[in-house]
Amino acid sequence: MAKGVREKIKLVSSAGTHHFYTTTKNKRLKLEKLELKKFDPVVRKHVIYKEAKIK
């Protein structure tokens, strides 16, 4: 069976609350790091989430 192209990543909140989302991205097509605006339930606001590696 072939190895998958998608890689698991963690999106960490830039608000400093240590809240994160997990998702996957195509590592062959998207070489730059993801930055998405998502809801942070700790501060109850939409903030920027930046990509980090899952350890």
Swiss-Prot record:
It comes from Baumannia cicadellinicola subsp. Homalodisca coagulata. GO terms for molecular function: structural constituent of ribosome. GO terms for cellular component: cytosolic large ribosomal subunit. SUPFAM superfamilies: Zn-binding ribosomal proteins. One of its GO terms (biological process) is translation. The keyword Ribonucleoprotein applies. This is Large ribosomal subunit protein bL33. Belongs to the bacterial ribosomal protein bL33 family. Gene3D superfamilies: Ribosomal protein L33. The keyword Ribonucleoprotein applies. Keywords: Ribonucleoprotein, Ribosomal protein.
